């Protein structure tokens, strides 16, 4: 029975393999007088034409189009061993350009009077070889960094391009808020986004101690409406993040009273 089962399984696997070979997931080529069948790794679904298959190799579709296997072999010849993580700075620029092109098109289409600014959240990737490439590739764009901790804020202050925004989210104690005032004093376009009225009270306290220049002040609000998908439960009136409508009005009154309303953004 075991032999019969294995035979049936092998026959089934063989049929499935032939089916795959005849599908669009494989490319057939003739080389050295015999047929070769090469898997295309689903490249049409994920590469966005940034990677291509040519001469039987996966290649980077940029400039002289180096093959990934050639890059790995060269790394091995230099004495490096796996695993290797390859980064392609030109892809960063492509993605940044796509984002700005989309928003610039929408701004023009709907005659929007404002400007589009963007920030990259450092919590996603703080690796120097990525952050430095991102900053370098977005010099001509108003593309800054978002910080959620003191260490990330120091990193943003050190590497954000001139006139690019810095956004501070997450928990902020007095020390971090003071650091935000220091960033404003250095000339950074920085916004402290408050999560609760207690943070706004601390900002007002630090403003009285340090004086101008002040950072911009943002308010995270708690919307009544909810979205869809896996984050649906984290939104709406029951969300633990942001100010309620009542707290929003109170925050505006506090800013107006302390003559800081002009920094509200």
Language model features by range: what are they?
Residues 1-2, 16-19:
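Polybasic, lysine-rich low-complexity intrinsically disordered segments
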Residues 116-265:
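Active-site-proximal beta-alpha core segment in soluble small-molecule metabolic enzymes
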Residues 5, 15, 36-37:
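Residue-level detector of intrinsically disordered terminal segments
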Residues 12-14, 21-24:
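Intrinsic-disorder-associated, low-complexity terminal segments enriched in Asp/Asn/His/Tyr and depleted
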Residues 33-64:
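N-terminal basic/disordered segments at the start of proteins
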Residues 3-4, 27-28:
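Ser/Thr/Pro/Gly-rich low-complexity, intrinsically disordered segments
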Residues 54-64, 69-126:
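Low-complexity, highly charged intrinsically disordered N-terminal segments
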């Amino acid at each position: 029975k075991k032999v019969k089962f294995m035979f049936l399984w092998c026959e089934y696997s063989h049929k499935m393999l032939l089916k795959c070979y005849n599908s669009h997931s494989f490319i057939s080529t003739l080389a050295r007088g015999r047929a070769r069948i090469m898997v295309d790794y689903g490249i049409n679904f994920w590469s966005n034409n940034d990677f291509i298959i040519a001469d039987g190799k996966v290649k980077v579709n940029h400039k002289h189009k180096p093959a990934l296997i050639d890059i790995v072999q060269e790394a091995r010849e230099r004495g490096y061993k796996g695993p290797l993580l390859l980064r392609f700075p030109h892809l960063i620029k492509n993605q940044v350009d796509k984002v700005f092109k989309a928003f610039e098109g929408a701004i023009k289409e709907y005659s929007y009077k404002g400007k589009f600014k963007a920030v990259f959240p450092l919590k996603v990737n703080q690796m120097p070889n990525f952050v430095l490439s991102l900053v370098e590739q977005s010099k001509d764009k108003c593309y800054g960094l978002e910080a959620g901790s003191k260490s990330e804020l120091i990193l943003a202050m050190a590497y954000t391009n001139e006139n690019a925004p810095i956004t501070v989210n997450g928990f902020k104690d007095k020390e971090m808020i003071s650091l935000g005032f220091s960033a404003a004093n250095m000339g950074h376009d920085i916004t402290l986004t408050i999560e609760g009225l207690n943070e706004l009270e601390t900002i007002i306290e630090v403003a009285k101690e340090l004086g101008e220049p002040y950072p911009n002040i943002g308010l995270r609000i708690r919307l009544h409406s909810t979205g869809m998908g896996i984050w649906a439960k984290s939104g709406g009136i029951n969300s633990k993040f942001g100010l309620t409508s009542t707290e929003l009005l109170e925050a505006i009154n506090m800013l107006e009273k302390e003559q800081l309303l002009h920094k509200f953004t």
